[in-house]
Amino acid sequence: VMIIFFCWLFKIEKTNVYQILGVIFSLFGVVVIITKADLGILLNLNFNKGDLWMVVAMFSWAIYSALLRKKKFDLSHISFLQTIITAGLIFLLPAYLIEIALGYRLNIHIPFILTLSYVVLFPGLASFFFWIKGISIIGSNRSGIFLHMMPIFSTLMAILIFKEKFMTYHFIGAMLIIVGIVLSSKGRRV
């Protein structure tokens, strides 16, 4: 939703009625899965400081994704990713130095190295590379809707790994998300 808003605000991409309907359907599907189709859960939400940070992260990601489509400089996807990683390391360096000054040390062992390798390779590098590539091919608006697939994949992983039961609300939410994605991929821009 926020990616479409910032694309509209910055005049980066035009949207269409199908995309708006698709976002509504898929967002409703996400809410169905997260709340287990229980309106009481939605009505009794309590917020804390961490939720505010998540809102900041959501806005940052939406602005990044919208502006990614607009980038006019001549960098390959790999070079652009390297630039983002370098900037991130520069911003994180002061926090790392403070931790060292306070006496915190990493306990490096094989499970730590394996976990760190996984996090660096897949969520850290591959996901960003494919996100940049996807936006360059189909645009920010159409790419953003695919973020709504996360609850579907989380459900599937919970079923496979933790033996969670597949419930009716999982099916309804997944169908709404899929309908939303299909809708958002149709139609001409207005």
Task: Give the residues covered by each predicted segment.
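Juxtamembrane helix-loop-helix junctions in multi-pass membrane proteins
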Residues: 63-88
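Hydrophobic/aromatic residues within transmembrane alpha-helices
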Residues: 9-11, 15, 71, 80, ...
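Hydrophobic alpha-helical transmembrane segments of multi-pass membrane transport proteins
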Residues: 5-6, 31-32, 52-67, 93-142, ...
